[in-house]
Amino acid sequence: MKKYISIVFLTLFVNLLMASVALEIQNVDTDAGTLDVYMINDEPVGGFQFELFNITILDATIPTGFLVSTTSSMVLGFSLTGATIPVGEGVLTQVSFTDYAGDEICFGTDPGYNVFF
């Protein structure tokens, strides 16, 4: 029985380590002050948080079943009902912004601030 539990635990742990989420900034329109955050995920996503630098975030669209909170540099998306974003790829959120000064727009560099669960 212990051997069976160990195998199940090891399998779950390996699957957790192999799950991945990739983000990319696309469709940047500096005149309109919008950009899309595109996501590819091989596991359901129950929430997200990321920072964007070299702009001031005004707002972000809401994935179905989620609440979104923004600060001037961070987007946080979560569900109070247990909703998840299914496996796949597509636009995660569209961000509205100001104060673009011609620099590159990039994600936060500290992995501790870019979280998916």
Residue ranges and their predicted role:
Residues 18-117:
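Acidic, low-complexity intrinsically disordered segments
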Residues 1-4:
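Positively charged n-region of N-terminal signal peptides that target proteins for export
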Residues 7-16:
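Bacterial N-terminal signal peptides
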